[in-house]
């Protein structure tokens, strides 16, 4: 019995190691925004590019009602504005939708998370944007994605796109759905390798999505898989790493005692 308890403790230690790390709910598998900072506000009077900090709590354009009412958890399913070509979830059971398309009116929403003293070898995250086309580069619906090294104030990953008429605000990763006049991307996987010059630094991921400035066209983005391991694609509904390690540990115990 004591040996069994000892082995169970070992399995628990393995699980605890799986839980260790800087990211909090990076894959949204808690079914909510725990670990993240949520923001939102009205951008009808502001031109592109937008300042995400202005829409976060304490920012000049922050509105709690917009922050809490325009973004949220989504479950697997096809996005109608892409011609049902995009699954709303990249990996697992949930992702986060930044902004929406149900309430168009010149709104912007933001989600952000900071990780400190980061030492894992990589940072990954997945995103997919959906933008309704109209207007020019400075007033079209837009998305802005940044990963910043806070320790050195260095912008490491930056993605900024908008739905200006004619496709001038997007690049080849975007597709166009004529039926909804929408520019959209399949899921994009971002990776930052953490070498010796970055190990131990603090990093911030900030994602903004916004309707157009004239307030008549939507823009939103799905976010998933912020963590140290590349998220597996949709279709393979993975266990969170912690539960996978627990299952591995307990499975090994069962095999060990079955052989005795």
Give the role of each language-model region:
Residues 2-10, 242-245:
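Sec-dependent signal peptide recognition
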Residues 12-13, 249:
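Alpha-helical transmembrane segments and their juxtamembrane interfaces
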Residues 238-256:
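A short, hydrophobic C-terminal helix/tail in secreted or cell-surface proteins
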